């Protein structure tokens, strides 16, 4: 058993890597490029607000990303209303970025938790508009089911608040979400180190998206490689099937044939 032929499928598109990474907070564009390479990711999320899409004569973040190698996932980071998020997605599509989008509609600046009411509103509009929508949402099975029913291609519940590095705070609701929806479940936000990514994947989620966990590390390139390995290891462990947890010991060697 390996992860080689274990593909992540989103809206009919196949990806070999189950790790998605962001492009913000790096010390330089060169460091970002090296970290992307080390991560092994194929889907790269880009904040539309950070991309110069109006004046192509000026330097843009996209100048540093090989779009033949990576699938761009424009995101609506910084949007607090459905209207703003929809407008941002349409601008990204008109600029030729992608019609597969990571939809974020935030509730406030303190927690960066999603405003689910506005999120559902935006998702309905974008799906009708022909977008492939991957919404960042709270770890609420009911909201995730509503997003699936709207037509979202995946759901992306948070593991913990964005940039917090707190890891997977509520694995139980993540498991319920996986039982509730049929679309891919991608844990988004809160991953702080490789063990967090492995834990998420061991739960059986389809993928993990992160930015700060890599870009904010002391050595982002090394951490990108660690996250790459952790996601693969966690996925393989999930497919292999862990032993059940129990209170008492079980001998690993048989008692038959012992010397008397």
Swiss-Prot record:
From the UniProt record, give one GO term of the biological process aspect: thiamine diphosphate biosynthetic process
Q: Give the annotated active site.
A: 102
Task: Answer yes or no on keyword Cytoplasm.
Answer: yes
Listed under subunit, the entry gives:
Homotetramer. Forms heterodimers with either ThiH or ThiS.
Task: State the pathway, as annotated in the record.
Answer: Cofactor biosynthesis; thiamine diphosphate biosynthesis
Q: What does UniProt give as the signal peptide span?
A: none
Q: Which Gene3D superfamilies match?
A: Aldolase class I (3.20.20.70)
Using the UniProt record, give the first listed, main subcellular location.
cytoplasm
The UniProt family comment states: Belongs to the ThiG family.
Assigned EC number:
2.8.1.10
Protein residues bound to 1-deoxy-D-xylulose 5-phosphate: 163, 189-190, 211-212
Protein's name in the database? Thiazole synthase
Question: What is this organism's lineage?
Answer: Bacteria, Pseudomonadati, Thermodesulfobacteriota, Desulfuromonadia, Geobacterales
Keywords linked to the UniProt accession:
Cytoplasm, Schiff base, Thiamine biosynthesis, Transferase
Give a GO molecular function annotation for the protein: thiazole synthase activity
Record's Gene Ontology CC terms?
cytoplasm
Q: What class of enzyme is it?
A: transferase
Tell me the CDD domains matching this sequence. Answer: ThiG
The record's subcellular location field reads: Cytoplasm
The catalysed reaction is: [ThiS sulfur-carrier protein]-C-terminal-Gly-aminoethanethioate + 2-iminoacetate + 1-deoxy-D-xylulose 5-phosphate = [ThiS sulfur-carrier protein]-C-terminal Gly-Gly + 2-[(2R,5Z)-2-carboxy-4-methylthiazol-5(2H)-ylidene]ethyl phosphate + 2 H2O + H(+)
- Note whether Protein biosynthesis occurs among the keywords: no
Task of the protein: Catalyzes the rearrangement of 1-deoxy-D-xylulose 5-phosphate (DXP) to produce the thiazole phosphate moiety of thiamine. Sulfur is provided by the thiocarboxylate moiety of the carrier protein ThiS. In vitro, sulfur can be provided by H(2)S.
């Amino acid at each position: 058993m390996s992860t080689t032929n274990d593909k992540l499928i989103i809206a009919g598109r196949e990806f070999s890597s189950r790790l998605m990474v962001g492009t913000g907070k790096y010390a330089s564009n060169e460091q970002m490029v090296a970290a992307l390479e080390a991560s092994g990711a194929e889907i790269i999320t880009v904040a539309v607000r950070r991309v110069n899409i109006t004046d192509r004569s000026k330097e843009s973040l996209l100048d540093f990303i090989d779009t033949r190698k990576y699938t761009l996932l424009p995101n609506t980071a910084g949007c607090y209303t459905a209207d703003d998020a929809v407008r941002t997605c349409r601008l990204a599509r008109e600029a030729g970025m992608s019609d597969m989008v990571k939809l974020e509609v935030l509730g406030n600046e303190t927690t960066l938790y999603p405003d689910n009411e506005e999120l559902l509103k935006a998702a309905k509009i974008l799906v009708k508009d022909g977008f492939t929508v991957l919404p960042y949402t709270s770890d609420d099975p009911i909201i995730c089911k509503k997003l699936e029913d709207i037509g979202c291609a995946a759901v992306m519940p948070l593991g913990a608040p964005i940039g917090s590095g707190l890891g997977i705070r509520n694995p139980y609701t993540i498991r319920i979400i996986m039982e509730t929806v049929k679309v891919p479940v991608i844990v988004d936000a809160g991953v702080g180190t490789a063990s967090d990514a492995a834990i998420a994947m061991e739960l059986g989620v389809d993928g993990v998206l992160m930015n700060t966990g890599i870009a904010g590390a002391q050595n982002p390139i090394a951490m990108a490689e660690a996250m790459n390995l952790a996601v693969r290891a966690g996925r393989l462990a999930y497919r292999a099937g862990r032993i059940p947890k129990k209170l008492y010991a079980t001998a690993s060697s048989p008692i038959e044939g012992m010397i008397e």
